[in-house]
UniProtKB/Swiss-Prot annotation:
UniProt membrane topology term: Multi-pass membrane protein
Protein name: 4-hydroxybenzoate octaprenyltransferase
EC number(s) per entry: 2.5.1.39
Reactions catalysed, as given in the entry: all-trans-octaprenyl diphosphate + 4-hydroxybenzoate = 4-hydroxy-3-(all-trans-octaprenyl)benzoate + diphosphate
Protein's GO biological process: ubiquinone biosynthetic process
Gene: ubiA
Molecular function GO terms recorded: 4-hydroxybenzoate polyprenyltransferase activity
Annotated TM spans: 13-32, 90-110, 112-132, 134-154, 164-184, 200-220, 224-244
Length: 284
């Protein structure tokens, strides 16, 4: 039982916030591609795929960080740096979760299967970027957004649809914004051990850049709504998101670690709010 608990911690099954943040834009894409009537077996496949692939991403992330996590207060007790899970076990778990994700995508179509290989590559690449660039959050944004063209493809959507790629870019902006809040919690430790992040790159302008990224996200989501002819309820949900983003800024204004982490967590409500507005729009 202790080993299962360690695996759950390594895969973040016990902390599903990252899976939710990946799930919401995936569901946005399914609903947009299907004009509000997605095939329910695809909804199930993608929700399961989100949780399995995000868990695989967490495992490979901790494997990549195994040499430095022991020097960071927040991560020093994770299964790998503490020795509760071996490197071999971590790699086997990553492979198992990746295979599970691939089995799920086999229930879609060839085009989506081919797109999934790009998604796997992005998920495996992201954890190593923090050693080479101050923009690892950009690579996370690309990895978290790749489910969007996959969802469009599985639903039979047009991959040249501008709404698809606007949603892709909007989600990249949103991901960089909320993961910068997350990186702000580790900034003092990261500076000591040489790990790079947007929180370090943006420095004293971190909150200003986050606000700009959130503004770009909402602008693109508004444009998508106009192009799709969505109901006014969708735009109300975006106005609510403005309030949620302001609350995050106000909460993190003093850059307290716990406050920044709460601002990161609050983005689950943003994703949920946009989804509710989208679903409500298609019901009207």
């Amino acid at each position: 039982m202790n080993k299962l608990k360690d695996y759950a911690e390594l895969t973040r099954f016990n902390r599903p916030i990252g899976s939710f943040l990946l799930m919401w834009p995936t569901l946005w894409a399914l609903w947009l591609a299907a004009d509000g009537m997605p095939q329910w077996h695809l909804v199930i496949i993608f929700i399961l795929g989100v949780f399995s692939m995000r868990s695989a991403g967490c495992v490979i992330n901790d494997y990549a960080d195994r040499k430095v996590d022991g020097f960071v207060d927040r991560t020093k007790n994770r299964p790998l740096p503490s020795g509760r899970v071996s490197e071999k076990e971590a790699l086997m778990l990553f492979c198992a979760l990746s295979i599970l994700s691939f089995i799920l995508v086999l229930f879609t179509d060839l085009r989506t299967i081919l797109l999934s290989f790009v998604g796997l590559g992005l998920a495996a690449l992201y954890p190593f970027m923090k050693r080479y660039t101050h923009l690892p959050q950009l690579f996370l944004g690309l990895a978290f957004s790749w489910a969007i063209p996959m969802a469009y493809s599985a639903q039979g959507g047009d991959l040249t649809d501008p709404k698809l790629w606007m949603l892709f870019v909007a989600n990249c902006f949103w991901t960089i914004a909320y993961d910068t809040y997350y990186a702000m919690t580790d900034r003092p430790d990261d500076l000591k051990i040489g790990i790079k992040s947007t929180a370090i790159l943006f420095g004293q302008y971190d909150l200003f850049v986050i606000i700009c990224l959130q503004g770009l996200t909402l602008s693109l989501l508004t444009w998508i709504g106009l192009l799709a002819g969505l109901h006014w309820l969708y735009f109300v949900s975006l106005i609510v998101c403005v309030g949620l983003f302001y609350q995050q800024f106000k909460q993190a204004k003093e850059r307290d670690r716990q406050a920044c982490f709460r601002s990161f967590l609050d983005n689950n409500r943003v994703g949920y709010c946009v989804f509710i507005g989208l679903v409500a729009s298609y019901f009207m």
